[in-house]
Amino acid sequence: MTLNIGVIGTGAIGRDHIRRCSKVLQGSRIVAVNDINRDNAAKVVSDLKLDAKVYDNGHDLVKAADVQAVLVTSWGPSHEEFVLAAIAAGKPVFCEKPLAVTAQGCKNIVEAEAKHGKRLVQVGFMRPYDQGYRALKQVLTSGQIGEPLMLHCAHRNPTVGEAYTTDMAITDTLIHEIDVLRWLLDDDYVSVQVVFPRKSAKAFPHLKDPQIVLFETAKGTRIDVEIFVNCQYGYDIQCEVVGETGIAKLPEPSSVQMRSGAKLSTEILTDWKDRFIDAYDVELQGFINDVLAGKLTGPSAWDGYAAAVTADACVAAQLSGEIVPVTLPPRPAFYNK
């Protein structure tokens, strides 16, 4: 059985997902493509030698009879309207983050999906599909180290461009930890504080870097996340869980260990795409399999909404320097199915 997919947005991530679905994964076929720049969409179809129709309008693509599922990889502010259109059409939709650019936009999607009565939305949070995070989750679920008491995490990038701003440390960078740590702990955040250490001389004048984000969860677990986007040395993701009877740490990516010139060394990756490339494959294959099986199991619209509410609280904490509550309404029973 093959799933016919339409893709809205053929920028870098859209093009990569089209390549992935048409050349790497099993059970899918790209039958429709749309982009605000029609020539760009046509070029992707030509370059990848696809038998796919190029649509001038994303809404027409969603309504197309041969499109069974939709990937939304367009400009962030357009995500909400296309996800809502897919829900209205009763079609499963995979939406790259952000689900919407505001928490209210995410809530609109949650309400529309609940009204439809069936899960149709998966959000593009890929870290729960990473082999290392899955292994860490398995350790926590097994109870081998008891209940998690504290987490020490870091998200480090070698450099960022001059357009990167202080709030983007939350909305572009920390957003991944916001999602994956909720999933890892099966817990929600109740408060957040952001503190700023001594500023790195490598950061642009307008950017506060590094930052430390301090969370408390509903179960009382404390989390500290270091965000350092000008660390220079590489792309480095760390996560250490301190439990009642032991410590579990996210494994490092596989790398050859070298002994040479009186030094023992291993390589550190420099690009986030290399660090999580396999997770992207597993994530989209999971979406395809779930749609064909008739039940989505990946990150939900509720997860996207929770991430947006938490990110808003983090940005408020950046500005105030105070402990800011993270206020989520009760999760609808619809998402407990």
From Swiss-Prot:
InterPro entries: Gfo-Idh-MocA_inositol_DH, Gfo/Idh/MocA-like_OxRdtase_C, Gfo/Idh/MocA-like_OxRdtase_N, MI/DCI_dehydrogenase, NAD(P)-bd_dom_sf. It is an enzyme of class 1 (oxidoreductase). It catalyses: myo-inositol + NAD(+) = scyllo-inosose + NADH + H(+). Its EC number is 1.1.1.18. Signal peptide: none annotated. One of its GO terms (molecular function) is nucleotide binding. It comes from the Bacteria. The keyword Oxidoreductase applies. GO terms for biological process: inositol catabolic process. It holds the Pfam family GFO_IDH_MocA. The keyword Acetylation does not apply. Keywords: NAD, Oxidoreductase. Homotetramer. Belongs to the Gfo/Idh/MocA family. Involved in the oxidation of myo-inositol (MI) to 2-keto-myo-inositol (2KMI or 2-inosose). This is Inositol 2-dehydrogenase. The gene is iolG.
